[in-house]
Design a protein with these regions (language model features):
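Conserved, carboxylate-rich catalytic/transport cores that coordinate ions
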Residues: 2-11, 18-34, 182, 292, ...
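Long, charged N-terminal accessory/stalk domains
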Residues: 1-395, 399, 410, 423, ...
């Protein structure tokens, strides 16, 4: 199996980076995105690491940029995105960036502070202007003799007349419009009705300088008598957050004051406009480089985070890092390190040393925009073990095909294909838009999955001969009614047609059935009353056939895993019993289906036995049923043999494998005791004689040295020793039988594990086969929904014969199209998608796919900037 069908071969490597070149080397590795750094300081607190101060400085710069970005969005200024990917700035450039951001932040804060103060002053002057205008109207109204009676109660002991209102005190102010009713009630109750309130709404909304919101306010003036009422009124105004302003008592003073306020408002408006223009210029200039600044800062922050994962030499001149990387990309990584060293100006080259380890490497499957969606489907179930067979390449075909078996409709498939083609053709433009809609992004990410699902749905729709619940008669039906009227046939007549609501064609009559339809199902079945009987039988058998083939393919893939990981025990006591067990029972059932289809024709079909009864009798060893005739000679002997073979496979998987594992453990234990008794000088000779290779021999021959406080091996080179051979890395205990010598062996645990696996597989073969019947059930449901929608909606418009039928048909077609998309494409499509997902995760992948690995997460600027990784 090539690299396409397995994860990439990985290696653990050690990087020796000079302190002055480490920053640039990590920067180049981030641009490459092919190494995953390991944390060599797991016990060191995050705040006690070497580059924590640099990380904090980057976070502070990021905070300032977010503040500027917030101001840009508040001003509705678009951010320029040229798609440029700037290089990472050097560490010495951080000071310049900090100074730039500090200056920009302070300038914006100063502008905002001044602007807020100016707006607050402008608001106060505007409110005072409205007060002066409205109070003059109030006083003019108070001069009206008709209103004197209303205020007479406030002037106890007065003589009345024109000068009476001037004896009253008053306050004027502005309050939010929604608080007026409560404010008025409070004044009435607290002052016991001894105040006189006049109010008027300000027509234009006023801008709140603190929030920038538009607020509706009202002007009020309160007349009262006495200092006690005055204090009460002011406290109430203060409680309701009303703004009080001084208002002259004489009309002349009010007029002069209004003129002065208008003049100040004009001057203030001019200053506000200039301030806003300056603010816009600053923000527009910042918006042009905002994205570039963000990229630079976040790249720097990511680099320093990564450097904190490294170990530092005691001389402070070298950084040591450990990384997982694909073997196929080692040359690219070496080249990136060389570029980083040259950029930094260092004369000492960076060193990449491949290490030998027993740790399980991460799983890395290379994908492109086409295969990434299918790989995500597999990874959602579980990340594959290292170098395990990857189901994604097979899923590219099997997933949309099984979906189409359930969804099969030519018309719906065309609609789905067109929608996916739109996303594929315009993918560059849609990617550039960077939509925040999660639902759209999810659909867009699976555009190639949807495209294949649509194409396969067209194919299965052709096989089913189903287009919006109607059949297409492209080649002419293979059935004919005319021979039934002949004397050699059923001797039908027109009276026969009139006297029978339902008549059945006899394919045994010559000329009635002229052979199968060239492509798909004969369209005559679309008008037959026994359509469901025929289609249900066909689709049910087809589901079982496809399911058994799919599962057998999954079991067959496990063979390649056992061969690759060199586990002959799993082949002879795992794969072979599993494939034989399934083939003996369900593979035989598939052969019976094809045999019955080919062995019985129109003349003998009435004598065809039931496969279901045959299969049940086969498992129960019941061959005395006279109602169910045998299919072929010697059927009893063959079926008994197959059942016995299947039953023999169960103890082979359950008991034999467990005993062999125990025997292997005892043999290893015997060898280890023999090693302890054998003198050290004869150990290697005895190992050579027994053919057992010591994994530690190479290590004992290799010396070690101290390199900056870190113990580093100085063993042979890659060519001499083949360091990090993929076979050594790929060793993992898939079935619990490949344990190292140090691992304890518990016979009870192994027996229980093997019993669970055997029972799960045997019962799973039965339940999984039945589970594939969902292909038939979903296909039937989709076809029936499509037919109901056509009959209940579209048929009404097409059957109209009136002059308004065209307009009615237009409305009905719109409803039909909406329901088709909403119910059949989206809801039914999602249902079929989920069922296909289950068939792959449970019925297919559990035959060979462990899915207990961990994903390769490389240090990549692209992933960090797209938000796929935490910074």
């Amino acid at each position: 199996m090539g690299e396409l069908f397995r994860s990439e071969e990985m290696t653990l490597a050690q990087l020796f980076l000079q302190s002055e070149a480490a920053y640039c080397c990590v920067s180049e590795l981030g641009e490459l995105g092919m190494v995953q750094f390991r944390d060599l300081n797991p016990d060191v607190n995050v705040f006690q690491r070497k580059f924590v101060n640099e990380v904090r400085r980057c976070e502070e710069m990021d905070r300032k940029l977010r503040f500027v970005e917030k101001e840009i969005k508040k001003a509705n200024i678009p951010t320029v995105d040229t798609g440029e990917n700037p290089e990472v700035p050097f560490p010495r450039d951080m000071i310049d960036l900090e100074a730039t951001f500090e200056k920009l932040e302070n300038e914006l804060k100063e502008i905002n502070t001044n602007q807020e103060a100016l707006k607050k002053n402008f608001l106060e002057l505007t409110e005072l202007k409205h007060i002066l205008r409205r109070t003059q109207q109030f006083f003019d109204e108070m001069e009206d003799p008709n209103l004197l009676e209303e205020s007479s109660a406030l002037m106890e002991g007065s003589e009345g007349g024109r000068g009476a209102p001037l004896r009253l005190g008053f306050v004027a102010g502005v309050i939010s419009r929604e608080r007026i009713p409560t404010f008025e009630r409070m004044l009435w109750r607290v002052c016991r009705g001894n105040v006189f309130l006049r109010k008027a709404e300000i027509e234009d909304p006023l801008e709140d300088p603190a929030t920038g919101d538009q607020v509706h306010k009202s002007v009020f003036i309160i007349f009262f008598q006495g200092d006690q009422l005055k204090n009460r009124v002011k406290k109430i105004c203060e409680g309701f957050r009303a703004s009080l302003y001084p208002c002259p008592e004489t009309p002349q003073e009010r007029k002069e004051m209004l003129a002065g306020v208008n003049s100040r408002i004009d001057d203030l408006q001019m200053v506000l406009n200039q301030t806003e223009d300056h603010r816009q210029r600053v923000l527009q200039a910042a918006s042009k480089t905002m994205r570039v600044w963000f990229i630079k800062v976040r790249k720097m922050k990511a680099i320093y985070h990564t450097l904190n994962l490294c170990n530092i030499d005691v001389t402070q001149k070298c950084l040591i890092a450990e990384v997982w990387c694909p073997v196929s990309d080692l040359d690219s990584i070496q080249f990136a390190l060389r570029r980083g060293t040259e950029r930094s100006g260092s004369t000492v080259p960076s060193i990449l040393n491949r290490m030998q380890t027993k740790q399980t490497p991460p799983t890395f499957n290379k994908t492109n925009k086409f295969t990434s969606g299918f790989q995500n489907i597999v990874d959602a179930y579980g990340i594959g073990n290292y170098r395990e067979i990857n189901p994604a390449p097979y899923t590219i075909i099997t997933f949309p095909f099984l979906f189409a078996v359930m969804f099969g409709d030519m018309g719906h498939g065309v609609l789905m294909t067109c929608a996916a083609l739109y996303l594929v053709i315009r993918e560059s433009r849609l990617l550039a838009q960077k939509s925040d809609n999660e639902m759209f992004n999810m659909v867009f990410a699976g555009r190639y999955i949807i495209l294949l699902m649509g194409i396969f749905s067209i194919y299965t729709g052709i096989i089913y001969n189903d287009c919006f619940s109607k059949s297409l008669n492209m080649f002419g039906s293979g059935w004919s009614v005319r021979p039934m009227f002949s004397p050699k046939g059923a001797n039908w007549s027109f009276e026969t047609l009139d006297g029978n609501a339902v008549l059945q064609l006899d394919p045994a009559v010559p000329g009635v059935f002229n052979g199968p339809y060239p492509l798909g199902i004969d369209p005559i079945w679309n008008v037959a009353t026994n359509k469901l009987t025929f289609l249900n039988s066909f689709k049910m058998k087809m589901s079982v056939v496809l399911g058994v083939i799919h599962m057998l393919f999954g079991v067959s893939l496990s063979l390649f895993n056992h061969l690759y990981f060199k586990k002959p025990l799993n082949i002879f006591l795992g794969f072979i019993p599993e494939i034989v067990f399934m083939s003996s029972l369900f593979g035989y059932l598939v052969l019976l289906v094809f045999y019955k289809w080919t062995a019985y024709d129109a003349f003998t079909s009435k004598d065809a036995p039931s496969l279901l009864i045959h299969f049940i009798n086969m498992c129960l060893f019941n061959y005395n049923d006279p109602t169910n005739k045998p299919l072929y000679r010697g059927q009893m002997g063959i079926q008994v043999l197959l059942v016995l073979i299947a039953l023999a496979c169960v103890p082979c998987m359950l008991i034999v494998k467990t005993m062999v594992l125990r025997r292997q453990h005892l043999w290893k234990k015997h060898l280890s005791q023999k090693r302890e008794e054998t003198p050290a000088e004869n150990l290697e000779q005895s190992l050579e004689q027994t053919g057992v290779s010591s994994s530690c021999t190479g290590l004992t021959q290799q010396g070690t040295q101290k390199f900056g406080g870190v113990r580093v091996g100085n063993g042979p080179t890659e060519d001499e020793a083949g360091i990090m051979d993929h076979d050594q890395l790929s060793q993992h205990s898939e079935e619990g039988d490949e344990h190292s010598e140090e691992e304890p062996f518990d016979f009870g645990d192994v027996a229980v594990h093997q019993a669970i696996h055997t029972i799960e597989y045997c019962l799973g073969c039965i339940s999984n086969t039945a589970s594939y019947l969902r292909l038939w059930a979903l296909s039937l449901a989709h076809a029936q929904l499509s037919e109901v929608l056509w009959t209940m909606v579209m048929h009404l418009g097409l059957s109209s014969r009136s002059w308004g039928g065209f307009f009615g048909l237009s409305i009905i077609f719109a409803a039909f199209a909406t329901l088709t998309v909403a119910i059949l494409l989206i809801m039914e499509g999602l249902s079929a998608f989920l069922h296909a997902l289950r068939l792959h995760w449970v019925e297919f992948q559990n035959k060979f796919y462990t899915g207990q690995g961990f994903k390769f997460v490389p240090f990549s600027f692209e992933s960090i900037l797209e938000g796929r990784l935490d910074e």
